[in-house]
Amino acid sequence: ICTNNKKIFEISKMLRSHGMVREAKNSIFEKKIINKHKYLSKKFIFLYPTLNFRNNEIGATIGLNQLKSLDKNNIKRKDNFIFFLKHLDEKKYFINFDLIGSSNYAFPLILNTKSLKVRDKFEKHLTVNNIEFRRGNAGGGNQLRQPYIKEFVKIRDFSNFKNVERIHFFGYYIGNYPNLKKEKIKKIVRILNNIKLSS
């Protein structure tokens, strides 16, 4: 796409990247949208219904090459997740996941709190300890709250969607890389278990 129209330029960047606001790379525009949608995770606001068109031939080649180790990596990820859950404080975090047939590229983490104040403190603690995370699990949380879907689905009362609402506000993903060592997982869990999750 070639354009000298700034609006089309910004929209095009979002359209190639899941419709995510952060991909516009325009801080003034981004700030305006974040302020308008304060109930969404600021890194995962989707304005347009679209796909991910960012990849290229190099990405495809890397992806095809990674398929060779897919089965091995899936086993490692599952083992990592079981190890992670085994050491996690169940008073602070939900740990009762169905693991049958599951291999997750991340550690899903759900807080056992309903306090936004506690949640915000939790996020600061992760940031200070250099633990990268996504709130709302894979990103974006409750899709019914996302701007892109509002013209298709007219739901404004989210009380019938208790589970996804809990994930939206108190669910996280932390990376589960196949080469993640047990010592590193222990360190992450130690940090998580030491966070005071009370008001």
Give a label for each model feature.
Residues 18-34, 83, 122-160, 166-172:
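Conserved PLP cofactor-binding pocket of PLP-dependent enzymes
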Residues 3, 109-113, 176:
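Short beta-strand-to-loop capping motifs
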Residues 12, 119-129, 188-193:
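Short amphipathic alpha-helices in soluble, non-transmembrane regions
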Residues 1-106, 141:
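Active-site region of PLP-dependent enzymes
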Residues 150-199:
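PLP-dependent enzyme catalytic core of the Aspartate aminotransferase-like
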Residues 114-121, 181-186:
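Short, conserved charged micro-motifs
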